[in-house]
């Protein structure tokens, strides 16, 4: 086996394969989202937050716009990360912060949309109660609770994200306790393993989702269909190698490096070997004995027999946080809110049909339904890909089809951040009047407090000035 020398460590990023179509599409989507979303959401924040009269609806959509604006602020880092093909030059703090912002946008948006749906449902079915209890202060309190829950849901991303540094190459990924799970393992291998043919794919987008394991046979390491696999590093308290080798070893969060025993591609940390060799301080099986010296790479992929990865057993140590994060995002951030919203809007439609008021011109209801629809269209691919990567077999044909679209689904989810301002403009008033309408007028029409009247409202409402004025809160 040819030894690894310093010359092989000088692989230039520009010498790697050209971007795949999925990478180019992701960069285009993210760039357009940033270019359109920042001014669009910024304008809505300024007008709705400063120029417009404060109402319950403006509070809802103001906080929703704030979540979108924060997400758009993080997108330039994601685009640069994609261009750099996995290299993360921004340090440990932003490695934790940027992926957390993307997840923050998801949870804040879905929770606020759920609150808006419940609010609209109550206005249709309990109009008198809403006139007496629905207020701007209550809306602010609900939004405050939404942000608290949202930050709690982002804690796992902030805690488990870590920075792996090998020489001058940094990778931002997930770190589950004593094992290191990192995205973009193919480029880390490609940078240090010159004898292996370079992969035909490229990576880069910040993956805010934990990636499942990839126990790929050695012959398939460089033909994987995606680079959004994780890289798992397992360390041992005992150092079977010389201290000189530490200079080549990866280290985490800028801390001094620990000696790397083995490098195995896969999203789930490798805790044990079926032959129990880890208990004796050795990671590799008896028939695999690659050496690691100061002038050698961590491990050559072709040193692993084809059946070596089949001998690995993944511990529950990382399975628990990884699957828990994926499932919690699906259930709390998608399924439960989706069920609540479908129920609310179904009840609204049922009441409107029952009272023969299907042509009621409730502008805010139309805006809310449109925003909810766009949100779920953008985020459905993200959750589908995440679940499929968890449940599919490592060598299944379905997995090979899904993997190339992993970071594309993240780009599409991020694109949701730029759509809402345009929905407000298109649905607020008749489109033919938009050109002559000021931004304030458009948003006032979109966020109007016009109630969807029901039979009970018509029969029970009091013709008092107080009740009349309370509809504009």
Swiss-Prot record:
Organism field: Rattus norvegicus (Rat)
Membrane disposition: Multi-pass membrane protein
GO annotation, cellular component aspect: plasma membrane
Phosphoserine modifications at: 448
Chain segments carrying region Disordered: 233-252
Gene Ontology molecular-function annotations: complement component C3a binding; complement component C3a receptor activity; complement component C5a receptor activity; G protein-coupled receptor activity
Topological region Extracellular: 1-23, 81-96, 161-329, 390-406
Function: Receptor for the chemotactic and inflammatory peptide anaphylatoxin C3a. This receptor stimulates chemotaxis, granule enzyme release and superoxide anion production.
Signal peptide: none
Modified positions (Phosphothreonine) in chain numbering: 452
Membership in a protein family: Belongs to the G-protein coupled receptor 1 family.
Residues that bear Sulfotyrosine: 174, 184, 308
Annotated keywords: Cell membrane, Chemotaxis, Disulfide bond, G-protein coupled receptor, Glycoprotein, Membrane, Phosphoprotein, Receptor, Sulfation, Transducer, Transmembrane, Transmembrane helix
GO terms for biological process, alphabetical: calcium-mediated signaling; chemotaxis; complement receptor mediated signaling pathway; inflammatory response; phospholipase C-activating G protein-coupled receptor signaling pathway; positive regulation of angiogenesis; positive regulation of cell migration; positive regulation of cytosolic calcium ion concentration
Topological domain spans for side Cytoplasmic: 47-57, 119-139, 350-366, 428-473
Transmembrane domains' residue ranges: 24-46, 58-80, 97-118, 140-160, 330-349, 367-389, 407-427
Cysteines engaged in disulfide bonds, as pairs: 95-172
InterPro entries on file: Anaphtx_C3AR1, Anphylx_rcpt_C3a/C5a1-2, Formyl_rcpt-rel, GPCR_Rhodpsn, GPCR_Rhodpsn_7TM
Pfam families: 7tm_1 (PF00001)
Sugar-modified residues: 9, 201
Annotated localization: Cell membrane
UniProt-recorded name of the protein: C3a anaphylatoxin chemotactic receptor
């Amino acid at each position: 086996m040819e030894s690894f020398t310093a010359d092989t460590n000088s692989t230039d990023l520009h010498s790697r394969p050209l971007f795949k179509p999925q990478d180019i599409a992701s960069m285009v989507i993210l760039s357009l989202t940033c270019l359109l979303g920042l001014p669009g959401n910024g304008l809505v924040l300024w007008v709705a937050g400063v120029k417009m009269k404060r109402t319950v609806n403006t509070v809802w959509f103001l906080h929703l716009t704030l979540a979108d604006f924060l997400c758009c602020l993080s997108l330039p880092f994601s685009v640069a990360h994609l261009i750099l093909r996995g290299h993360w030059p921004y340090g440990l703090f932003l490695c934790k912060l940027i992926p957390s912002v993307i997840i923050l946008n998801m949870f804040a948006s879905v929770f606020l949309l759920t609150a808006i749906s419940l609010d609209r449902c109550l206005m249709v079915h309990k109009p008198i109660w809403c006139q007496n209890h629905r207020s701007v202060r209550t809306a602010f309190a609900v939004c405050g609770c939404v942000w608290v829950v949202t930050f709690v849901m982002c804690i796992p991303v902030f805690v488990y994200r870590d920075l792996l540094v090998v020489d001058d190459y940094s990778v931002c990924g997930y770190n589950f306790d004593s094992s290191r799970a990192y995205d973009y393992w193919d480029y880390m291998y490609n940078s240090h393993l010159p004898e292996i043919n370079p992969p035909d794919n490229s990576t880069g987008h910040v993956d805010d989702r934990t990636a499942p394991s990839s126990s790929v046979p050695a012959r398939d390491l460089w033909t994987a269909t995606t680079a959004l696999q994780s890289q798992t590093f397992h360390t041992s308290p005992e150092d079977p190698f010389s201290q000189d080798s530490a200079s080549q070893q990866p280290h985490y969060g800028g801390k001094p490096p620990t000696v790397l025993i083995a490098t195995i591609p896969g999203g789930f940390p490798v805790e044990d070997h079926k032959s129990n060799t880890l208990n004796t301080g050795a990671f590799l099986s008896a028939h695999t004995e690659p050496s690691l010296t100061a002038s050698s790479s961590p491990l050559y992929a072709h040193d692993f027999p084809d059946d070596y990865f089949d001998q690995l057993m993944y511990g529950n140590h990382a399975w628990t946080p990884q699957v828990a994060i994926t499932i919690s995002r699906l259930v709390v951030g998608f399924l439960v809110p989706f069920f609540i919203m479908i129920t609310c809007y179904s009840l609204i439609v049922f009441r409107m049909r029952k009272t023969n008021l299907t042509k009621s011109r409730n502008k805010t209801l139309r805006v809310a339904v449109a925003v909810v629809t766009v949100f779920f269209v953008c985020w459905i691919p993200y959750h589908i890909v995440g679940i499929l990567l968890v449940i599919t077999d490592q060598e299944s044909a379905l997995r090979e089809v899904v993997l190339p679209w992993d970071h594309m689904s993240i780009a599409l989810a991020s694109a949701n951040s730029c759509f809402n301002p345009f929905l407000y403009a298109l649905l607020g008033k008749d489109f033919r009047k938009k050109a002559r309408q000021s931004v304030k007028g458009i948003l006032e029409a979109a966020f109007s407090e016009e109630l969807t009247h029901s039979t009970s409202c018509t029969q029970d409402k009091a013709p008092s000035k107080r009740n009349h004025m309370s509809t504009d809160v």
